[in-house]
Amino acid sequence: MRRRRRRDGFYPAPDFRDREAEDMAGVFDIDLDQPEDAGSEDELEEGGQLNESMDHGGVGPYELGMEHCEKFEISETSVNRGPEKIRPECFELLRVLGKGGYGKVFQVRKVTGANTGKIFAMKVLKKAMIVRNAKDTAHTKAERNILEEVKHPFIVDLIYAFQTGGKLYLILEYLSGGELFMQLEREGIFMEDTACFYLAEISMALGHLHQKGIIYRDLKPENIMLNHQGHVKLTDFGLCKESIHDGTVTHTFCGTIEYMAPEILMRSGHNRAVDWWSLGALMYDMLTGAPPFTGENRKKTIDKILKCKLNLPPYLTQEARDLLKKLLKRNAASRLGAGPGDAGEVQAHPFFRHINWEELLARKVEPPFKPLLQSEEDVSQFDSKFTRQTPVDSPDDSALSESANQVFLGFTYVAPSVLESVKEKFSFEPKIRSPRRFIGSPRTPVSPVKFSPGDFWGRGASASTANPQTPVEYPMETSGIEQMDVTMSGEASAPLPIRQPNSGPYKKQAFPMISKRPEHLRMNLEL
């Protein structure tokens, strides 16, 4: 029987297969600092005299030349400074990247405010579909909160999150390299050095999640994206389980069967060691063209995972064979990575002996595959079944009641990098200290983000009183969030502006799908 692949495309809409998650709390707001320099009455009086002198030809204690003045256009944007309110109309639809049971994923361009002109992926989820099931709602919250909390070079970045009366919107970085699955589909199998690179970057992402008490639980080629340089980015955090530290287990039956650890199938309780089994299954898939245990149907696949011997092709090196055996141990306690060293145990294996981990984390190691892209908007690495469709975000005409909308309070988010850019853009610091400083209005910069209680989407009872944990330093921006207004209106919003596909100066056909993988594992294009 042919395996049905969850074909949601880029950043798939959550597929809540018996998932579990916990609600969280915490609201963040913008606080304005006190004026930098209000000035004394004497200074104001002196300023008044200065103005009088300027009215008479600039004669007086200050001679002001034009080189000391800064010109800028007076507009609504420059006068009403501060973070913009993000809404669907801020984005122009470019292409469809994927579809799922809960909504669509679009390639979009921001057309207003900060990041104007930049390309993103916009994940649109229908509230009415999500609230039908409590677990679906909880896992939507969990995915959004994990994306907010986790910042790492090999994990997708959340830029904005906002909502309307009937929809949730996640604005993510656009990863133009497409899915790792597409590369496997095209190449058939990877050489060991190629697989080593991808597995090393993935192991660093998994290790970072585990440090935060998060189990990923859905590692497979479809959930591994590549950026424009070819580096790995983990996506789709709907199956993650939080607050799983040493000694803690969970019992949810979830994941994709071919990559699922035996302890999940047996429902005997599992911990972060399941991710290392999945890494082994993924490694086997990369090197042989299929996962280690597959059957004609779901039951036979499960039986093989629980009972069958691992068959290793003779062409694999001794290091690859040894790593596969240690990752695919059915006894979770003896599995490589299950010990206190976690990712460090896996990374110390001789298979990774040529990896410089510091340079890898800094993304200084050249990827084995670099996408050939014609422009920032290039979608050639994505399935043309989706990209050739006309992008349409249906009108928001299914608004929930006010009580039903309460579960989505606190969904809104703005990435700290965006807040910093807004702060820098509107600082208007003079290059030369000018007398205008004494007579103009003082600047009011945006203050650092502060905690405040009362939100349903935070991270536990202590979130409102404790300082946010300082993240591990990576070669990227640090974490932080910003709460903005939540739209609860039941009014229907107009559809987003549409750009027709295959338009513009850059038009490139998707690469041909060379079907080298086994028939039952090939991409199922039926929705």
UniProtKB/Swiss-Prot annotation:
Keywords: Acetylation, Apoptosis, ATP-binding, Cell cycle, Cytoplasm, Kinase, Membrane, Mitochondrion, Mitochondrion outer membrane, Nucleotide-binding, Phosphoprotein, Serine/threonine-protein kinase, Synapse, Synaptosome, Transferase, Translation regulation
Modified residues (N6-acetyllysine): K516
Source taxon at top rank: Eukaryota
Pfam family, any one: Pkinase_C
Oligomer and partners: Interacts with PPP1R9A/neurabin-1. Interacts with RPTOR. Interacts with IRS1. Interacts with EIF3B and EIF3C. Interacts with TRAF4. Interacts with POLDIP3. Interacts (via N-terminus) with IER5.
Processing after translation: Phosphorylation at Thr-412 is regulated by mTORC1. The phosphorylation at this site is maintained by an agonist-dependent autophosphorylation mechanism. Activated by phosphorylation at Thr-252 by PDPK1. Dephosphorylation by PPP1CC at Thr-412 in mitochondrion.
EC top class, as a word: transferase
Binding-site list for ATP: L97, G98, K99, G100, G101, Y102, G103, K104, V105, K123
InterPro entries (alphabetical): AGC-kinase_C (IPR000961), Kinase-like_dom_sf (IPR011009), Pkinase_C (IPR017892), Prot_kinase_dom (IPR000719), Protein_kinase_ATP_BS (IPR017441), Ribosomal_S6_kinase (IPR016238), Ser/Thr_kinase_AS (IPR008271)
Motif residue range(s): TOS motif: 28-32
Principal cellular location given in the protein's record: cytoplasm
Protein name from the UniProt record: Ribosomal protein S6 kinase beta-1
Family the entry assigns: Belongs to the protein kinase superfamily. AGC Ser/Thr protein kinase family. S6 kinase subfamily.
Transmembrane residue ranges: none
Organism of origin: Bos taurus (Bovine)
Region (Autoinhibitory domain), start-end ranges: 424-527
Molecular-function GO terms, alphabetical: ATP binding; protein kinase activity; protein serine kinase activity; protein serine/threonine kinase activity
